[in-house]
């Protein structure tokens, strides 16, 4: 099944930053004032929301999101979300897909920094998204302008209703300054701040999946391109979380058996200046970090001695030759001094 097209109107922060509310990275919906019609956890599902006509449960129409009962008192509904990592929030997407007569007229988002435990009555909340008018069956992209790092959010619905998905895009905050300069870090890991700048094709699976933690759960939990019918090869460019010297690379083709790439190679560079989009052309000429290597189906491949000594780099380009699917990419390196 081909992937649905991404929203062409989505702002840059949805592509540039990590979804800190992704449960695959560790985010959790902790508590809610009410989730009678649809559980709060469903709001964080990384898959796009769906609508299933005729599907009902004991509480009524099944909806793919978080939905509260009709409020017959004063006040408003809320849900507390623990982010996957502490981070500086750059923007959110409050998605009401398929909620038409049951979406909230407005919503706001507050944030708190609670490094130990969960928020309580003494927690100080800071509004990062003011009360925003919502429409049914729509994405609502709101930029956040707070430079502080937060660990938890409180989503407020005025007064009640349902939202399909909550995406919270931000920069994970790690103590890189205090980190060891001799330890190995997965500099491409999404939870560390690595992200996919661009990929030439993502027909069957998003390139960003290769940066997720753990091994892929199935073939859909990886990056897969369409069958190439012309010369050339497919590729994805990854911005590393921090500049570093690459010591080891792992390429995992888990679950890809009749559709894994025949070969792969990696280029890398230390990029200063320019924009993400300007890297696409430049990356063709980057130095080779890993020359062409044969791949096997459903296997973790590790490369160390094969890596060229390029010094510190900020970006890598994974080439899969000619096409196919990769489950995970790990780029282990030491931090640039």
Swiss-Prot record:
Its EC number is 3.5.3.4
Task: Specify whether Hydrolase is a keyword of the entry.
Answer: yes
Q: Does the keyword Glycoprotein apply?
A: no
Per its record, the protein catalyses: allantoate + H2O = (S)-ureidoglycolate + urea
The protein's matches in NCBIfam families, at most eight in alphabetical order, are given as: allantoicase
Similarity field: Belongs to the allantoicase family.
Give the protein's recorded name.
Probable allantoicase 1
